[in-house]
Swiss-Prot record:
Name of encoding gene: SLC2A2
Protein name (Swiss-Prot/TrEMBL): Solute carrier family 2, facilitated glucose transporter member 2
Extracellular topology ranges: 39-110, 158-163, 221-229, 337-350, 401-413, 467-471
Originating organism: Gallus gallus (Chicken)
Function: Facilitative hexose transporter that mediates the transport of glucose, fructose and galactose. Likely mediates the bidirectional transfer of glucose across the plasma membrane of hepatocytes and is responsible for uptake of glucose by the beta cells.
PANTHER family the record matches: SOLUTE CARRIER FAMILY 2, SOLUTE CARRIER FAMILY 2, FACILITATED GLUCOSE TRANSPORTER MEMBER 2
UniProt lineage: Eukaryota, Metazoa, Chordata, Craniata, Vertebrata
Description of how activity is regulated: D-glucose and maltose competitively inhibit fructose transport. D-glucose, D-fructose and maltose inhibit deoxyglucose transport.
UniProt keyword annotations, A-Z: Cell membrane, Glycoprotein, Membrane, Sugar transport, Transmembrane, Transmembrane helix, Transport
Pfam families xrefs: Sugar_tr
Xref: PROSITE patterns: MFS (PS50850), SUGAR_TRANSPORT_1 (PS00216), SUGAR_TRANSPORT_2 (PS00217)
Positions bearing carbohydrate: 64, 69
């Protein structure tokens, strides 16, 4: 078989591989849906909370366009920003019956949003343990119970104390998503052939933005975002959980887990044959054997060892920084201002403009699926950060000069769309799967757990702190993010390796400065960051 034929064989998609990846990323679809769904029915849920708690809210809208009845906005902890305007909340002020403080209602709403991120933070540390203990497929099966339970509580919210049921349901769903955000990249990276690992890994982000977009559309008033149907809207993600549960029964276990962790050679070969079809599995078996030998020498790696061992230090720093750059890039801030900017630009229904941003979000995530294996992870990550930096500067100029030149609102609108586009090109999808690529089998579960916790924690911090930064800096708030983006760009240029087309062993070896055969070293020339570290 010549080189071209081998490459085509390595890029061959079988039905089992497609089913396995689709089933796994349903976990990220639920993640995206849960991020976006709480935003659309905000007004009706707040009103319901008010009735439940004995307060009668006056007519006051969460996204008020009138200057005489302006809305003061606060940031909701746990805000996420893939196409969602979640994060702006009208204080529940002005109640005819003051039996309940408006601050209490604000607190309950804040908890309804933020407990999702808290749940994710708590569970993310157990990803490595449950993934190794149960196996990748069985672990995803078991944690689906959390999603089903959480969505059931929210779907039945009107039948009990709604605020308690929603807060509990969001927390339990967050527990599921924290586990899923680690297990899914782990499984997808391990079942994907090297030539397709980047493209298939990008599907995580596509599932997230699709979930957000669908939740935004279904949350429109004339669909499910009304006083009668909002519990159904909140609990609808449980359908995806049920679908994933039954489809997982048809998916093969990760051959890498079977071979390296359990030593089940024949079962690993059977799993590979199901995933690869008629392709000869011996090349991948040989790669696994090398990785198994490395894993045997390093044994099981705990989170403490991950940080204390100089062997993993560079890879850990890179893994954490790509997660931090995703959350601290300013994407949340962009969507914090987007509704107001759309209004000032003359858009009559800002919610539809936000959905339009969600559509752009989804389209460019699809494009990134095809770009990631052609341009490489490192190149796209750098391009995305630089594009976001330029867009942040343009956004600052637009906001500062908006009061002097009305047409600057259009500059701001263009900057929003460009910011989102560049985010989806690199910093959006790449952190989710590059962490799994940076580590060999031994430290991979611990590394994914730490990176997942970092992502969730940064998500929560941004939600908690952004309002104070915005109040302090005003329209110059994006200067802060521009500086951060510059720091992230310089770090990525110096330290983030190219993982395109590399085996796990080759990537790990680059961080260890291990000398590989001449051919492998030629393939690793782009790993400048790992070699210079």
């Amino acid at each position: 078989m010549d080189g071209k034929s081998k490459m085509q064989a390595e890029k061959h998609l079988t039905g089992t591989l497609v089913l396995s990846v689709f089933t796994a990323v349903l976990g990220f679809f639920q993640y995206g849906y849960s991020l976006g769904v709480i935003n659309a029915p905000q007004k009706v849920i707040e009103a319901h909370y008010g009735r439940m708690l004995g307060a009668i809210p006056m007519v006051r809208h969460a996204t008020n366009t009138s200057r005489d009845n302006a809305t003061i906005t606060v940031t909701i902890p746990g805000t996420e920003a893939w196409g969602s305007s979640e994060g702006t909340l009208a204080p529940s002020a002005g109640f005819e019956d003051p039996t309940v403080s408006p601050h209490i209602l604000t607190m309950y709403w804040s908890l309804s949003v933020s407990m999702f991120a808290v749940g994710g933070m708590v569970s993310s540390f157990t990803v490595g343990w449950i993934g190794d203990r149960l196996g990748r497929v069985k672990a995803m099966l078991v944690v689906n119970v959390l999603s089903i339970a959480g969505n059931l509580l929210m779907g039945l919210a009107k039948m009990g104390p709604s605020h308690i049921l929603i807060i509990a349901g969001r927390a339990i769903t967050g527990l599921y998503c924290g586990l899923s955000s680690g297990l899914v990249p782990m499984y997808v990276s391990e079942v994907s052939p090297t030539a397709l690992r980047g493209a298939l890994g990008t599907l995580h982000q596509l599932a997230i933005v699709t979930g957000i977009l669908i939740s935004q559309v279904l949350g429109l008033d004339f669909l499910l975002g009304n006083d009668e149907l909002w519990p159904l809207l909140l609990g609808l993600s449980g359908v995806a959980a049920l679908l994933q549960f039954f489809l997982l029964l048809l998916c093969p276990e990760s051959p890498r887990y079977l071979y390296i962790k359990l030593g089940k050679v024949e079962e690993a070969k059977k799993s590979l044959k199901r995933l690869r079809g008629n392709c000869d599995p011996m090349k991948e078996i040989a790669e696994m054997e090398k990785e198994k030998q490395e894993a045997a020498s390093e044994k099981r790696v705990s989170i403490g060892q991950l940080f204390s061992s100089s062997k993993y230090r560079q890879a850990v720093i890179v893994a954490l920084m790509v997660q931090i750059s995703q959350q601290f890039s300013g994407i949340n801030a962009i969507f914090y201002y987007s509704t107001n900017i759309f209004q000032r630009a003359g858009v009559g229904q800002p919610v539809y403009a936000t959905i339009g941003v969600g559509v752009v979000n989804t389209v460019f995530t699809v494009i990134s699926v095809f770009l990631v294996e052609k341009a490489g992870r490192r190149s796209l990550f750098l391009a995305g950060l630089m594009g976001m930096l330029i867009s942040a500067v343009a956004m600052t100029v637009g906001l500062v000069l908006l009061s002097q030149f009305a047409w600057m609102s259009y500059v701001s609108m263009v900057a929003i769309f460009l910011f989102v586009i560049f985010f989806e090109v690199g910093p959006g999808p790449i952190p989710w799967f590059i962490v799994a690529e940076l580590f060999s089998q031994g430290p991979r579960p611990a590394a994914i757990a730490v990176a997942g916790f970092c992502n969730w924690a940064c998500n929560f911090i941004v939600g908690m702190c952004f309002q104070y930064i915005a109040d302090l800096c005003g329209p110059y708030v994006f200067v802060v993010f521009a500086v951060l983006l510059l720091v992230f760009f310089l770090f990525a240029y110096l330290k983030v390796p190219e993982t395109k087309g590399k085996s796990f062993e080759e990537i790990a070896a680059a961080f260890r400065r291990k000398k590989l055969p001449a051919k492998s070293m030629t393939e690793l020339e782009d790993l400048r960051g790992g070699e210079e570290a």
